[in-house]
């Protein structure tokens, strides 16, 4: 659309599958727009009569001037085929899934982009799920794939009273929901860093996809672990961990809060545990699910308890916090209330101001609807 008038210039449906959607922000590189494709089909499998699943993740490249589609690269090269019939007599298709929930990261040096993928949605699980892809910017050719976790096939039928379409692998649903980071370490090395819902952070060599280091930072879970986005700066990787309750039992302890890692080695430099201030409130949990931001030496981390905390980037100490679940008088004179911080958009800074958005009333979190502007002074 025209930024000045709103006039439509061109439009295109990125994927023809009826459940396809776009959850990650597209990435712009010159006159080419790279659009990640995900899907809501994972939720339909709870119905035993639904033929699960036929959607695949992809990236679509567009010429921004004309809207011409330059290429589309699927995370699963071949369309799903009939695999079995479930206990309800419904056809089951696969491999499927490996959706791209996050925004592509551009690697100008090597003319490629990076994406992370989700789980397979039906059996059989394949090599494309819970993986990092490097894709050529010009041709869409896959340069390499790093799979962090094999045999992860899961959908919303799993763990319900209608499990007929749950894949035989049955999870654990440890996507890469958060976007990757291109990081330059203190030693001058470039790394691709990715945080997973398992709570593990992976650092890869960008040319080959070879693992350089990995570290378990959180317990992990269906909503993380690392859910929506990390940040980096001054040789550190800042990792938000949610580790909220999800009905499962785990061998590792919960570590909700904010962690700082040495980008060269993956060593944990500091950990700021998330305080539990929920006091029994419904849908309130400690932990950080929302994407975080590094602004002027501070790490802004909005938590699931509705509190935005600014941490000292060197020490992790909380130097400012504001509870957005309390009522505020808006500029229109109406009362506004926030809720849990969630989703892929963290704090945004401009001209000495920080903009935050509070309220995330899905997946058993606190609803709210408030846009707030803060001063960084």
Regions found by a protein language model. Give the residues of each.
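Long, structured ligand/cofactor-binding scaffold of large enzymes
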Residues: 25
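Extracytoplasmic/lumenal domain signature
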Residues: 1-20, 29-31, 42, 46-95, ...
């Amino acid at each position: 659309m025209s930024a000045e008038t709103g006039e439509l210039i061109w439009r295109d449906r990125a994927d023809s599958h009826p459940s396809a959607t776009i959850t990650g922000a597209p990435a712009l590189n010159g006159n080419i727009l790279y659009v990640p494709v995900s899907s809501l089909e994972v939720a339909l499998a709870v119905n035993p009569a639904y033929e699960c699943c036929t959607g695949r993740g992809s990236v679509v490249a567009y010429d921004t001037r004309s809207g011409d589609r330059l290429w589309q690269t699927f995370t699963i090269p071949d369309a799903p085929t009939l695999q079995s019939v479930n206990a309800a007599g419904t056809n089951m298709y696969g491999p499927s899934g490996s959706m791209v929930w996050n925004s592509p990261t551009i690697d100008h040096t090597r003319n490629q982009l990076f994406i992370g993928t989700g789980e397979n949605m039906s059996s059989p699980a394949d090599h494309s799920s819970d993986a990092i892809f490097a894709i050529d910017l010009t041709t869409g050719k896959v340069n390499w794939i790093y799979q962090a976790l094999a045999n992860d096939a899961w959908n919303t039928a799993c763990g319900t009273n209608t499990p007929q379409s749950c894949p035989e692998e049955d999870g654990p649903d440890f996507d890469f929901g958060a976007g990757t980071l291109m990081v330059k370490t203190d030693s001058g090395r470039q790394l691709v860093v990715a945080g997973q819902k398992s709570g593990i952070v992976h650092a890869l060599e960008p040319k080959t996809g070879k693992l350089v280091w990995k570290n378990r930072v959180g317990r992990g879970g269906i909503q993380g672990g690392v859910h929506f986005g990390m940040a980096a700066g001054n040789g550190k990787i800042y990792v938000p961990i949610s580790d909220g309750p999800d009905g499962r039992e785990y061998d590792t302890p919960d570590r909700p809060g904010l962690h700082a890692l040495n980008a060269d080695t993956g060593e944990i430099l500091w950990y700021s545990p998330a305080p539990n201030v929920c006091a029994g409130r419904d849908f309130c949990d400690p932990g950080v699910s929302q994407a975080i931001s590094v602004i002027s030496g501070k790490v802004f981390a909005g938590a699931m308890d509705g509190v935005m905390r600014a941490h000292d980037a060197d020490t992790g100490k909380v130097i400012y916090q504001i509870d957005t679940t309390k009522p505020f008088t808006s500029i229109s004179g109406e009362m506004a209330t926030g809720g849990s911080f969630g989703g892929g958009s963290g704090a945004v800074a401009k001209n000495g101001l920080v903009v935050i958005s509070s309220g995330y009333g899905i997946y058993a979190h606190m609803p709210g609807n408030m846009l707030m502007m803060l001063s960084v002074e």
